[in-house]
Structure formats: structure tokens, C-alpha cells
Amino acid sequence: MLISEVTEQIGLSKKAIRFYEEKGLIKVARKENGYREYSEGDVLALNKIKFLRMCGISVSDIKLLFENMVTLDDLLQKRKKEIESEHDLHFSQFDNISQMIDSYKNNRFNLTDSFEETSVSNAELSDKLAVGIDIGSTTISATVIDTQNNIQVESYTVSNGAEIIVENPAFYEQDPLVLCDKAIRLIEIITDNYKNIKAIGVTGQMHGIVYIDKNGNAVSNLITWQDKRADESFKNEVTYCDNIFELTGQTVNTGFGFATHYYNCINNLVPDNTYSFCSIMDYLVMKLTETTFPLLHSSVAASFGLFDIKGLKFKTDAISKLGIDNVTLPKVTDDFYIVGRYKNIPVSVAIGDNQASFIGAVDNLDDTILVNIGTGSQISMVTDSFEENETLELRPLIKNKYILCGSALCGGKSYAILEKFFRSFVTASDFPEASKYDIINKLVLDAYTQGKNTPTVEPFFRGKRSDPSLKATISNITEDNFTPGQLALGFVKGICGEAYDFLGPRCKTKKQIIASGNAVRKIPVMKSVISDMFGLPVEVTNNKEEAALGAALFAASSVGINNN
């Protein structure tokens, strides 16, 4: 079948069909005269692609589906969440999604409407592309950027599927081989499709460690930042973390690499053939570059604890006092360093996900505050000065620059708790159980425009890092403001206020705020509340997969192709 016949049959333009072939979604045979010959299988694949694209599924996600890295159900759940957050905008697509599973699985498309593909063709890209990979706690993401044209070309996200069930409920571990295999498959898909990749950058979940042997192979699971073993009682009812502080005067939180290693040493859980340890992103870099010993960026090394940020070295005296100097410590750099190559593509040293997210979300590092409100919340700003603070964490960024970071345990989660409260009342009234975010958001906006004095909400449902025993409170309630809308607005102000309390007085020299995170996107009034509190303009970032984007930009800088 010729391309003109395919176009007439399924309503796709020639440009779109060739674009899908360019992206590797179809592989079309050619006749002896060089003309493409489309088979029934090609037409079926194009019908599937068109159907998925009309439902709003991205080209990169379709690629993952065809490569068997995600299931159709994975894509549908992801798309439904996207649509629910922008329900009015995507109402017609929501109807399509609801009927999609049966139609797709039975190859029933019957699409007569034409569809115009708007994605960027490879031919429009420069030869200065970079890839970023982010190994997150639940997903692995990748993004491709064109540094010359300053665009984010394509993004991919898959479930990491690496969690390992262990007997002790305080332990939280993942399989490093599963994580690396999936990350490498993503990189292979990208490098097969894009021939102008000049750099690969890596980031991922900080604090956690994986033990390695002398050959650079993992000899343990990844013990993640969510692990709570160091919070268990040690002696005299103090925790392992408490004991670290008593012996060294250094605070190392549970889930941090050295707190985990301390627990493992005392309880004989360090594998016999352990030589060193590293983060999961460092381990991926080692596998990509076929190196055997970890080189850590300072942003990652600091996340383990017991690290001298100014001197760029581990605190060996404190480590010796704890009796845990039984491994060879990784090397550390604060430079834009190329560790090695993967398929002749330079691979930069891995950086921490907080730092990568900052780089990926913020254009002007020195003038901008980043407020990220997801399940928790985090506020970050760049400083050139070295300063330590009890409520703020100082983290290395790049040479001679640091991030001052304040983190709250319950950001958007607080709003979710409120939504669950309202939904339970509605369900008890025999109405269908469904999300009530749209209704609450409308009430919050109405309350905001009224400008009344709202109830004061301290959303400490999970305590504070400095005091885990704290509880949430609601006060300043009056007859006038005790309404669902005013209460919900109080929650929004409480969430934003906790972020402001970390850095507010220090923000006078900054010019703008970049807001990111699902809560900011799902609660429209939050942008205005943040702006009111800080007295600065707020822009909600449209960047996708900010940590992966930041890793790509870091790698691009490492090879000299970053124009920013």
C-alpha cells in the first residue's frame, strides 16, 4: 500500500506518517524502486498511534508502549490523572479515555476525522542534544533537550518497579539492577532515535546507598532515603541517629547513607565483600561508563551525612569515632566532570535530584526562589556564602554556589487530607464517591476574592523535621470565617506559610519565584497566595521532569554545549 492510500484510509497526513517512522514507531519496508510499501501491520500500528494521540497520549509514551516498557493500563492511568487535573480543558478526551481500553485491545478504531501531528521532527533539531535521566523513588524519567534551540524535545517516564519486600517494616529497599536496567533501556531508546546526543546526565533519589565490591558491582540492595532503620532503639532507648550525635556531635538523619551504614555495621548487615558504596545514580554512571569505583558529585556526597561541604570531603574523624571506617570512601568532585562514555557519548558525574530540579526549573539561579509543593514542600534559593542554620539545610550546587533549602513534611498532602474529609461527608450523604478538588478549588477562589481573615492552619500532620511530635492545629475561627471555603483557604495559606517561614526574610534580594509541583498546578489560587506572602511575582514552571532536565543541562555544561 502506498503512502497516499494510507493517508486516505486513516486520515493522517504524509508528514505525520513519516514523522512516526522517524520516531521509530513503525518500520516500513521499501520496494526495489525505493518507495515505501505499507503493510496491514503498519496501517494497524498507525491507527493505534492516531487513536492514542487523539486521546492526548504523547509520542514518547506511545514509544514506551510499543517497546513494552509500559502497559496500556499504565498510560491510561497516567492520562486520566492529567485530564482530571485539567478537566474542563480535556473534557472530550476524557470521554475517549473512558471507552479506550476495550476499543484499543480489540483493534476497533473507526477514526474518520483527520489528525494533525504537531510534535517536533528530528529534522528541525540542532546537533547539540543532551539527555537527562532521573532515577526517582517510584519512577524513572528521561528527557531530551536541544541546547541550541533551547527546547525540551521529549520526555519519558516509567514506573521503576524495583521495591523489595523485606521482613522488617522499618527497612525500605529497592533492586539496583532493576533500576539500572530500566534506565539503560530508556537511554537505548533515546540514542537509537536521536543521533546527535552529545552528553548524558544522571540524577536521582539522594541519601540512599548501595554497597559495591572491588569490581564495581552491587552486593546489596539500594537502601533508600525512606528507610527508617536508624530510628530504631539502640541503647538506653536512644536511636541510632541519637547515638551518632552523642558520639560525634553531628546530626545524621535516618535514611541518610551514614546513618544506614552505622546501623548495618552494628548489626552485621554489611556484606562481606563490600569495598565501597555509592548512590543509585552513581551506580548507573558506573554501569554506563564501565568504571569500577564511584566518583560522587558533592551534591550527592553531602546527602549521606558526615560531609564537610566547605572542604569537599567526608568527616573521617567522625566516621572513625563511630567505628564504621571499614569501607573505602568514594572520591568527590564539585566540578562539571565527565566520568566516561556510553556508546561514545560523554556521561557526566551524577548530581543530586534537589540540585537538578533547581537547575531544571530556574533560568536565573541567583535571582530566583524555587517553591516546590507536592506531597511535601520545599523552598530553595542559591547563595554564594557558606552559612549553617538549624532550620535550613545548606547543600552544594555547583562550584562555589550552594542551595539553602527548607523542607516541610506535609505540603500538598494537607490539602489532600482536607479533600478526604469533605469527600467522606459527601459519601455518607449517599452521593457517589469522587474527587472533590474542583469544588474545593472553587470555594477557595471565592474565599480569596472576599479578602476576609481566614482561620489559621498549621498543617503539621506529619510533624516537622525539627520536631516530629508536633501536631496540626486550626485556630482563629470566627462565626464569619468558619466556612468550607475560608477553611480551605486557611489550609493553602498554612502550606505556603510554612515555606515562607524558612526563607521569607532572606528573599528581599531576589526578583521572582518559580513555583512547581503537583499541588501548585492543581490549586490555582496557590500561585496568588505565594505571591502575596513573598511580595514577588510568581511563575509556574511548564518544564516537564525538572530533575531529568536539570541533569541534561548539567551534562551539557560539562561538554560545553549549554547556551544558558
Regions inferred by a protein language model and the residue ranges of each:
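Basic helix-turn-helix/winged-helix DNA-binding cores
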Residues: 1-64
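Short, charged amphipathic alpha-helical surface segments
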Residues: 50, 64-121
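Amphipathic, non-transmembrane alpha-helical scaffold segments
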Residues: 76, 80, 87, 180, ...
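Active-site core segments that coordinate phosphate-bearing ligands/cofactors
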Residues: 131-132, 144, 238-251, 262-279, ...
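Short beta-strand-loop/turn "lid" adjacent to the catalytic site in phosphate-handling enzymes
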Residues: 170, 192-224, 251-255, 285-308, ...
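Carbohydrate-associated surface elements
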Residues: 227
